[in-house]
A protein has these predicted regions:
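Conserved catalytic breakage-reunion loop centered on the nucleophilic residue
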Residues: 1-194
């Protein structure tokens, strides 16, 4: 039996330990995938969910268990683009259990690091799928294509991968040039719009 202990957003743990679909959250997951297929990116989807006052995954977990590290009482319905992006990447929505995505560097250090794909184990069809295979694959293709060139005609090394730690918005490449040197940096997309 797969050993993942915590269900992802969209699922609950059943009495036998298997994941069962959470109808309320599964509806939101399907909506996120539909919005992505319609051409919306994580930032726009997050904004739409926030405007609809849909509780975030952290808020839902807090309401069920009374504890979570991802619950912000002042913003119970404020979705981040980072949360949406993670939902769009999760293979668990295909009905698969994914184990060993991260590992601890040392027993002395609490932080985890992402494992390479060859160390990740996927157990297929362990629970009911929320998203069908064709939809999931199409979303992955669309997400890869969204990494578009910047105004200098280059696709940044971190394009589509960096998100603001404060608000969850996408980070954009900014270039500063002087006669002597060129400096690239990344700034928050929300900050740029102010």
């Amino acid at each position: 039996m797969p050993i993942t202990s915590q269900p992802v957003y969209g699922y609950l743990k059943g009495p036998d330990g298997h994941f069962i679909v959470d109808p309320e959250a599964a509806t939101v997951v399907k909506q996120i995938y539909s919005l992505c297929l319609a051409g919306n990116g994580p930032t726009k989807i997050a904004r739409m969910l926030t405007e609809q006052n849909i509780p975030t995954p952290g808020t839902m977990e807090y309401r069920r268990t009374g504890s979570t590290r991802r619950y912000y009482p002042d913003y119970p319905c404020k979705w981040s683009s980072n949360t949406v992006a993670h939902i769009l990447e999760r293979r668990e929505y295909l009905g698969h259990t994914v184990n060993f995505k991260t590992e601890k560097v040392s027993y002395k250090v609490k932080t985890s690091v992402a494992n390479p794909e060859n160390k990740v184990m996927v157990f297929e069809h362990t629970h009911e799928a929320i998203i069908d295979e064709a939809t999931w694959e199409r979303v992955q293709e669309l997400r890869k294509q969204r990494k578009r060139p910047n105004r200098y005609g280059e696709v940044g090394l971190f394009s589509g991968l960096l998100f603001c730690a404060d608000c969850g918005s996408v980070m954009y490449q900014q270039r500063y040039e002087t006669d002597k040197r060129r400096q690239d940096c990344y700034i928050c997309g929300s900050y740029k719009k102010r």
